């Protein structure tokens, strides 16, 4: 069984969300920025930060010219701030080695900082209309249910081949990829699928009576984790115009000093924070100079 391009594309034509990075005139760089931000982060949180980012830094060279600390500030509370650092590094390479133009092919994209298998294919597909399979959790879920009749499936080395076999052999392949992703994000969701409005008339999971999944879902806890502590420490540094003392950081997490120290050490190791000669702390690039006026 396959997935009908006619059914899927007809649905996508009227049901797709009006996301800013999908609009006409959006550049390959701006699409790349959206892909960095959308990793493990809901669309609703990404939209305002992406829009502000693109208004401020519309090109790779503009992003590269900004200091890493300003990039971290603009990233705000999107989470996983190492993505911001890698995005800045990616901008530097594109500006200096590719004349400010995002590479078109997957193999070259894979050589850029912070770009893995998914992001490389997403940029090639959505920015340059390349007919390449793009597989995220939403796409994997739709294909697993509609084609294989299971509720879920773990990531597999066969995913790319499986999705590639579904792509229509014409210029609609990139739109088909976007539609698969949209269907998984808005209709064929993990917890509460809206099968009553699904455009796919042939779905093996539905035909099989919706068998339960076998893959245990991990519930990602945030409260009390090192991620939360790292975020609180970064908040202090983002809000400061000068390096701060250890005492100013200590007060953000008094309940577990060892965890706080571990979180701070990890920020230093990741290159997101630096320590000055007198023992104070600042965002990367602002240790000696402070925040630019």
Swiss-Prot record:
It catalyses: Hydrolyzes free adenine bases from 7,8-dihydro-8-oxoguanine:adenine mismatched double-stranded DNA, leaving an apurinic site. [4Fe-4S] cluster binds at residues 188, 195, 198, 203. The record marks 136 as: Transition state stabilizer. GO terms for biological process: base-excision repair; mismatch repair. The active site is at residue 35. Keywords: 4Fe-4S, DNA damage, DNA repair, Glycosidase, Hydrolase, Iron, Iron-sulfur, Metal-binding. SMART domains: ENDO3c, FES. CDD domains: ENDO3c. The keyword DNA damage applies. This is Adenine DNA glycosylase. It comes from Mycolicibacterium smegmatis (strain ATCC 700084 / mc(2)155) (Mycobacterium smegmatis).
């Amino acid at each position: 069984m396959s997935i009908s391009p006619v059914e899927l594309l007809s649905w996508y034509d009227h049901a797709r969300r009006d996301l800013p990075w999908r609009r006409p005139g959006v550049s390959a760089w701006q699409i790349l920025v959206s892909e960095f931000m959308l990793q493990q982060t809901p669309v609703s949180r990404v939209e305002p930060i992406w829009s502000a980012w693109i208004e401020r830094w519309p090109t790779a060279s503009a992003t590269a010219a900004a200091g890493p600390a300003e990039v971290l500030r603009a990233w705000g509370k999107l989470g996983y701030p190492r993505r911001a650092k890698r995005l800045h590094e990616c901008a530097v390479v594109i500006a200096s080695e590719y004349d400010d133009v995002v590479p078109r092919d997957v193999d070259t994209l894979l050589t850029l900082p912070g770009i893995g298998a998914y992001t490389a294919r997403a940029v090639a597909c959505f920015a340059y209309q390349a007919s390449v399979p793009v597989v995220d959790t939403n796409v994997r879920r739709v294909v697993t249910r509609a084609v294989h009749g299971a509720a879920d499936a773990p990531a597999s080395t066969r995913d790319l081949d499986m999705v590639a076999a579904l792509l229509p052999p014409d210029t609609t392949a990139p739109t088909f990829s976007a539609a698969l992703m949209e269907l998984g994000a808005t209709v064929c969701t993990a917890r509460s699928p809206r099968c009553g409005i699904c455009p796919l008339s042939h779905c093996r999971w539905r035909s099989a009576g919706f068998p339960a999944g076998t893959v245990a879902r991990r519930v990602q806890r945030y409260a009390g984790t090192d991620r939360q502590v790292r975020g609180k420490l970064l908040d202090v540094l983002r809000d400061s115009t000068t390096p701060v003392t250890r005492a100013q950081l200590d007060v953000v997490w008094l309940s577990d000093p060892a965890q706080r120290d571990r979180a701070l050490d990890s920020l230093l190791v990741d290159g997101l924070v630096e320590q000055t000669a007198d023992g104070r702390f600042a965002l990367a690039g602002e240790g000696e100079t402070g925040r630019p006026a």
